[in-house]
Amino acid sequence: TPSLEGAGRQEILNICSKTGCQIQVVPGIYQLVNGEVTISKLRRVELQDLLGRDPIRVNLGEICGYINDKTVLITGGGGSIGSELCRQIARHKPRRLVIFDIYENNAYDIQMELRREHPELTLDVCIGSVRDRGRVDDLLDTYQPDLIFHAAAHKHVPLMEDSPNEAIKNNVFGTYNMAQSAAAHGVKRFVLISTDKAVNPTNIMGASKRLCEMVVQMMDRRSGTEFVAVRFGNVLGSNGSVVPLFERQIACGGPVTVTHPEITRFFMTIPEAVSLVLQAGYYAKGGEIFVLDMGQPVKIDDMARQLIRLSGFEPGVDIPIIYNGLRPGEKLDEGLL
């Protein structure tokens, strides 16, 4: 039942998942009493039920007035976080929403979705790279955005270990280009999407994002634009995250690969991530790094076993689990500060 605290719900889920039975969640008592739903409205266990904590809920209606009638630019707007930002912002009546992405297919998908769901929205989709300063300046000259949410980045830890130059060029110089242009064009507020891997970084991707944070903090001291950063943990269900990988491996009959039996990570859902970004945009005074309280870290091995059981299999029997060792630059545990 949703009325259980996150830890209690997690304990019951752990017990039930070992029975081999299908697990469903009943509506909350308050929903039944208010007539919002009926007892027949059961739902399957969802990704956020695996977090072991209550979901973070934010009344965005109270804080998103700063978006109303503003021109908003989202870099990397076709990605997991960027596209959800587009969806949320579109609901709060911006004057214009500008999506900037190098991947045309992703940009096209979110463009079609927003035109279908928000036909009244003034929407522009622009293809290009944050590494191209001329293109960035041309974009800001054309649209004169009030707010920029900078989500464009390379984020895959192992791939960036093999291509460090690309991580620096795209993440660091891309952020520098966007920040310099934002300051030159009088943008009111600039929000950088960062990561918990920027804390005492041990890999190229984390180090590049820490440099991005330093860039925006430096720019905040030197310009009238308010520059802030938002630091995430791992995002459940995002492109390239561990859960879709596990689901594909389970669907293929295994094995499920985990780097280390004791490795832990902080997790959040995409809506939680976006609510933090939008809150940061509201509360920003300039120079801050915002961090979401994500509760206790989750053991990846436990998550893999739960997903196997929720798929109707027994871990280690029907679906083997293989531990293939920490990858270069990978930590056993992450921090937030």
Name each model feature, range by range.
Residues 126-147, 329:
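Conserved Rossmann-fold cofactor-binding substructure of NAD(P)-dependent oxidoreductases
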Residues 8-26, 96-103, 142, 147, ...:
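NAD(P)-cofactor binding segment of oxidoreductase domains
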Residues 35, 150, 154-213, 218-220:
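Conserved Rossmann-fold NAD(P)-dependent oxidoreductase catalytic core, especially the SDR/UDP-sugar
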Residues 283-337:
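Mid/C-terminal beta-alpha module of Rossmann-like enzyme folds, strongest
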Residues 9-71, 183:
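Flexible, Lys/Arg-rich cytosolic regulatory linkers and terminal tails that connect or flank
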Residues 1-34, 102-111, 116, 123-124, ...:
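A solvent-exposed beta-alpha-beta segment
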Residues 71-92:
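N-terminal Rossmann NAD(P)H-binding glycine-rich loop of SDR-like oxidoreductase domains
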Residues 160, 245-268, 272-300, 323:
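A conserved pocket-lining segment of Rossmann-fold NAD(P)-dependent short-chain dehydrogenase/reductase
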